[in-house]
Amino acid sequence: GERDSVIRVNMTDTLFRMQLPFVPSRVLPNTDGRGYGVFVPDEPALHWLAAHWWEIEDDTARQSLLMGLYENYLAKHISADDWVNSLITGLPAEKNALVASTASGYLANVMREIAPANRAEVEARIYTMTQNHPLPSCRIQLMRLFMQNAISEPMVKKLYILWQQQSDKHLNRQDYTTLAYELAIRMPLESEQILRTQRARIDDPDRLRQFDFISRAAVSDTARLDTLFNSLLAAENRRIEPWTTAVIRYLNHPLREDQSVKYIRPGLEVLEEVQCTGDIFFPKNWAAALLGNHLSSSAYEEVV
């Protein structure tokens, strides 16, 4: 029968050759996580890992190999759809909170790369995990991921009912406010009503000020959105930097990618002024909010 063998090597170059006293069925690199760099298994081992990582009993090895799979996805050795399928197949069985959190984070990073034909099924499987995953912390993380990424009509409807009833007790008040922003963007005909209802739920004066500042970016009127963006080019209108970053992010929401390309160049042109007038981290946050949701060639042309 098969058994696992751990062989430690001292790699000083990109290639290491050694003789084995047996014929391995697969070679899984860096199972203890001590190696640094991208470890690329051969194709059979990579496919096996993608289909079986959750079956590995040792928590450290499972975490390390999951990280290795992610690195191979980034290196284009695994397709986005295969990677998503691997994550949503293995994640329901994951009982280690750290490994589950890592897998959920990887899932968030790849959602926009999924083929449109597979999107609805993936969203439905994620929603199922938000309801029945054995780890409460994972259910919360997945629900927050789901809130930010669901676009299929049945799943948006589920989110709307959740927001109306505030039925998930694991979510906090800020989660429901964030959900209101997301729903307002997804449901433009109901955006004013959603934002008005959410505002009425807020009784803390500071949170109300924050809501009034950020919610302007969730309305459906493009002229108002353009005016809002242009106002943020003036330093006096972006004094509260975390709120400003949130506004820029919603203005450049993935569902608004086509209409928000026009914000990129003026947003970058003011970056030096943002650096001079803001906190040391604000320029990075500004640029990330401005560019992070853009994947189009037209957006690329704005920055080259």
Functional labels for PLM-detected ranges:
Residues 14-16:
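Short strand-edge motifs at loop-to-beta-strand transitions and within beta-strands
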Residues 3-4, 19-304:
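Long, ordered, helix-rich scaffold segments
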Residues 6-10:
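Solvent-exposed serine/threonine-rich low-complexity stretches and specific carbohydrate-binding patches
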